[in-house]
Amino acid sequence: ADLISPWADVKLDVQAMPFPSSQFDVVICNHVLEHVQSDIKAMGEIYRVLKPGGFAILQVPIDISREKTLEDPSINTPELREQYYLQRDHQRLYGRDYADRLRSVGFRVDENHFVDELPLNLVERYALPVGEVLFICNKPD
């Protein structure tokens, strides 16, 4: 699913998904939450559509030098967003508090560092960002 992509089989806004609650076993949301107006609302929607016992992988760009996510309504032009959030269409720049934001909607979060354990040739082959943490978010039973 995607809001814009012509290849998506379902067009949707992740902040208001047209699915019943407890519909999916797995949700993968890769570098989307930094683009939406309300990431907390989107996280809550993902939590809602997951079945109990299901999990989501929710990846975002993170500036690990930041303790807290930078999110300021006065950063509201493409130029300012690029300057502060590193991309013209981003709504925020996540910090080390990202997992806490996920927990705030009910997820149990596992910060998985598996990329660090892979041989460099596989990291390069699959274009994995070195040091990227996988945020595996479980919905309790």
Which residues does each PLM region occupy?
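S-adenosyl-L-methionine-dependent methyltransferase catalytic module, highlighting the catalytic core
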Residues: Q37-Y47, K51-D141
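A short acidic, Gly/Pro-enriched loop at the edge of an enzyme's catalytic core
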Residues: L12-V27
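Conserved protein kinase catalytic core
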Residues: A8, F19, S65-E67
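Short, flexible active-site loop motifs that bind/organize anionic cofactors or intermediates
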Residues: V14, C29-V32, D89
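A short SAM/SAH-binding and catalytic strip from SAM-dependent methyltransferases
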Residues: D25-Q37
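Class I SAM-dependent methyltransferase SAM/SAH-binding core
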Residues: A1-A16
